[in-house]
Amino acid sequence: MAREYKIEDYRNFGIMAHIDAGKTTTTERVLYYTGKSHKIGEVHDGAATMDWMEQEQERGITITSAATTTFWKGRDGKMRRFNIIDTPGHVDFTIEVERSLRVLDGAIALLDANAGVEPQTETVWRQADKYRVPRMIFCNKMDKIGADFYRSVEMIGSRLGAQAVVMQLPIGAETEFKGVVDLVEMNALVWRDETLGAAWDVVEIPADLQARAQEYREKMIEAAVEMDETALENYLEGKMPSNDEIRSLIRKGTIAVKFFPMFCGSAFKNKGVQPLLDAVVEYLPSPADVPAIKGVDAKTDAEIERHAVDDEPLSMLAFKIMNDPFVGSLTFARIYSGKLTKGISVDNTVKGKKERIGRMLQMHANSRADVEEAFAGDIVALAGLKDTTTGDTLCDPLHPVILERMEFPDPVIQIAIEPKTKNDQEKMGLALHRLAAEDPSFRVKTDEESGQTIISGMGELHLDIIVDRMRREFKVEANVGAPQVAYRETITRKHEQDYTHKKQTGGTGQFARVKVLFEPNTESEEFVFESKIVGGAVPKEYIPGVEKGIQSVMGAGPFAGFPMIGVRATLIDGAYHDVDSSVLAFEIASRACFREAAPKLGVQLLEPIMKVEVVTPEDYVGSVIGDLNGRRGQIQGQEARGVAVVINAMVPLANMFKYVDNLRSMSQGRAAYTMQFDHYEPVPTAVAQEVQKKYA
């Protein structure tokens, strides 16, 4: 079976947004107009096709990024193949967003026209910047009370520091929103309400918008001609580019991430979705337009590139693992080069294992089709892989490559969890193991002293959902303890410690002497170890033992048993014995050396500080600020946003538990907040003593 669509006709993109900016609704409309789903699913009644896990339907937020394949005929009448990756917008799931951004070629950033650029929009935007993802902006919810397109344009500059190139102007706003002005063609599109937005009329631009349309068209052309010297010279001489030239220049600038074309509409009211789909074809890159993916040769560690062509060796990245009730475990993978055929064996170069490709599926949001082969640029779901987890590379065994690993943040919150019955015990272990394989930002460990199972994640909602999924998908009932903060310890003073480890018990003894300088690592939170041994006072082969010994103590710090960060250790001297020294002896010596040095290093407890943003009606500002101050918060500032006030604060995580309930009762349910981890900071002495009493 040959390739059906040329790679130039592929668009792999995601829709990224803040909670409630209308992401699922927009995706639904896209699926509806591209003919994949017959009944439009509304999030309001819990029936959207993309949100296929039960909880998502209840909470109305999207949790797992499902990949969907669909087709769209562009303005030129040619069919294009869209692979849409649904990304979550809730801050507890930013890991999912990062993961989907890795495998996208482009994205549509949704804004709520009423709120403009919201806190989570900034987070997701920064992540997309990190991976240099070309984006278009869709200003959604133009029918909402308080919708303001022009303020949203301004906020993209002021809050994101990005250049939006306005491609459409809204006709009317709020309940009067009727359609859009197309600034390339200079005409107006007005939707017919009675056809569910499937039909629209092309009319002249309303008189009251003509001057504004002219002004924004000029801005658009100025941005476009910057992308090409000849076009710029012609423009300066008064020669206007043709509409097709404008489109190709805007495409060039979008793919180069120089600016972001901006559109508007209301997905809920079915207005503006089709021009947005045309724009995906016109402006977002195909897999052939983005730089080749870089990796390292698994044998030689040399950097190599893989291009999006079918005759290069196969390489693909597993970016999501899901449990499907019918097929079992599904691994979603993006093929970067080569082609994949059912039944072949591939190498997992990260794990050093082989995998056999059994069933290959192309996914719609909740239905699936078996395929025999897939090509560069495709996104496929593979059933029954044994050892592959998120972020692994699968490739041709003859040309092993490791595509770059993704970085996953450390969890900031943990809770103890125990099964309700003996029967649940075994099932719980299996369930947690499966969920951890799906989600690298979720960790499971057993507390050695208490024997409790501890789960940790990115926030309260994250862990709530994990416990909820255990109950639904694995039928495991569990009791959950109070959340605990992931404290850290660090040192504040420097000290040189000399320690000799001697043990003589007949036969071979143990001997090692180390002299280590411990000091705070002021540059980062990492542990840095270096050896300044000269003249072989400690032989090279024993030095890793010294590092390992120090690291083993850092796993449980001396203050209250929390992991240590920000330590720099330098091995400056030592001694060994020809017979009695070993790596183990040096490991034991350096461990004891660090323990002896600890009381002199000024060990200090650190706590995670969260960046909190509360959006509240004016009436409650006083109570919200008072409450945040009472939580040891530091108010960073406040600003008006429409009729609401935005309060920014840095607050210790320890004081943010159950905040959502308090905020609700304080503001009669009208205020909302988001928080994300920002940095670690020393804990005040009185609080530190309480923590020490509780944990040490």
From Swiss-Prot:
GO terms assigned for molecular function: GTP binding; GTPase activity; translation elongation factor activity
SUPFAM superfamilies, sorted: EF-G C-terminal domain-like, P-loop containing nucleoside triphosphate hydrolases, Ribosomal protein S5 domain 2-like, Translation proteins
GO cellular component: cytoplasm
Binding site for GTP: 17-24, 86-90, 140-143
Subcellular location: Cytoplasm
Keywords: Cytoplasm, Elongation factor, GTP-binding, Nucleotide-binding, Protein biosynthesis
Any Pfam family matching the protein: EFG_C
GO BP terms, alphabetized: ribosome disassembly
Superkingdom of this protein's organism: Bacteria
Main location: cytoplasm
InterPro entries: EF-G-like_DII, EFG_II, EFG_III, EFG_III/V, EFG_IV, EFG_V, EFG_V-like, G_TR_CS
Coiled coil regions in record: none
Residues in tr-type G domain copies: 8-288
UniProt keyword Cytoplasm, yes or no: yes
Family of the protein in this entry: Belongs to the TRAFAC class translation factor GTPase superfamily. Classic translation factor GTPase family. EF-G/EF-2 subfamily.
PANTHER family: RIBOSOME-RELEASING FACTOR 2, MITOCHONDRIAL (PTHR43261:SF1), TRANSLATION ELONGATION FACTOR G-RELATED (PTHR43261)
Function description: Catalyzes the GTP-dependent ribosomal translocation step during translation elongation. During this step, the ribosome changes from the pre-translocational (PRE) to the post-translocational (POST) state as the newly formed A-site-bound peptidyl-tRNA and P-site-bound deacylated tRNA move to the P and E sites, respectively. Catalyzes the coordinated movement of the two tRNA molecules, the mRNA and conformational changes in the ribosome.
Name of the featured protein: Elongation factor G
Species of provenance: Mesorhizobium japonicum (strain LMG 29417 / CECT 9101 / MAFF 303099) (Mesorhizobium loti (strain MAFF 303099))
Lineage: Bacteria, Pseudomonadati, Pseudomonadota, Alphaproteobacteria, Hyphomicrobiales
